[in-house]
């Protein structure tokens, strides 16, 4: 589990409470009265959440980020066991769709990816303990609270997770420029795990050696790559398209 941390932003706090996260306390800016703030107050009262009104200066001391007049302290997020999650997804008769993040270290990219993964019905996100972005306030806010609505698994080594997925009948597909195969030419309409690489290095070469397939997005401009969260969205929505 991560150490206790803060989340900021009204919508992210609402999502956390509604998803059943253990919110210890919410600090609300005095005299804040937007419609979204009123929604937060209703959600807190229904959930019997401890809160207090504070000057904006206190909120600014709690976080340098755009807090929108609300900061919450939240208990650590529980991570899922990968093997148990795979079994649960398969027992429920779902066609598994997993997302593996190979040492993506930027918290905002991580949050954006989590948000897209939740929107596209990903059954679980898998990250490596070492070298991966933490689940912190930036992650939670960028994900718009989606981090509380999708299972996240932490593993010692990405390769071990890939071997487990493959042994469970789940195809592994790595997003990489080091292939001639286009994402639109491979099947994602089956149990599959999509692997996205780090912002600077991409998918680790040792990982590329063991995956079932490699695929890339077509590029038509002079810049040869996309932000990882954007590329991830393109891959996931292609999976959605094929499964629809």
Predicted regions located by residue number:
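Structured adenosyl-cofactor binding patch, chiefly the S-adenosyl-L-methionine
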Residues: 14, 19-20, 141-144, 205-244
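Surface-exposed amphipathic alpha-helices with a cationic face
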Residues: 45, 162-166, 240
């Amino acid at each position: 589990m991560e150490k206790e941390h803060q989340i900021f932003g009204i919508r992210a706090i609402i999502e956390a409470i509604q998803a059943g996260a253990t919110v210890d306390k919410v600090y609300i800016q005095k005299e804040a009265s937007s419609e979204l703030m009123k929604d937060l107050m209703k959600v807190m009262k229904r959930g019997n959440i401890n809160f207090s009104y504070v000057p904006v200066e206190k909120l600014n001391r709690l976080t340098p980020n755009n807090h929108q007049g609300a900061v919450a302290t939240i208990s650590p997020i529980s991570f899922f066991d990968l093997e148990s999650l795979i079994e649960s997804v398969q027992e429920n008769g779902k066609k598994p769709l997993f997302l593996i993040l190979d040492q993506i270290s930027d918290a905002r990219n991580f949050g954006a990816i989590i948000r897209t993964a939740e929107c596209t019905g990903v059954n679980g996100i898998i990250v490596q303990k070492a070298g991966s972005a933490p689940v912190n306030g930036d992650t939670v806010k960028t994900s718009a609270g989606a981090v509380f609505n999708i299972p996240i698994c932490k593993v010692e080594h990405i390769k071990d997770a890939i071997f487990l997925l493959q042994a469970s009948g789940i195809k592994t597909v790595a997003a990489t420029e080091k292939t001639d195969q286009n994402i639109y030419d491979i099947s994602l309409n089956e149990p599959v795990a999509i692997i996205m690489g780090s912002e600077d290095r991409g998918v680790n070469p040792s990982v590329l050696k063991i995956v079932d397939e490699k695929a890339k997005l077509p590029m038509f401009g002079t810049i040869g790559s996309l932000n990882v969260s954007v590329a991830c969205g393109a891959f996931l929505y292609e999976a959605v398209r094929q499964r629809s």
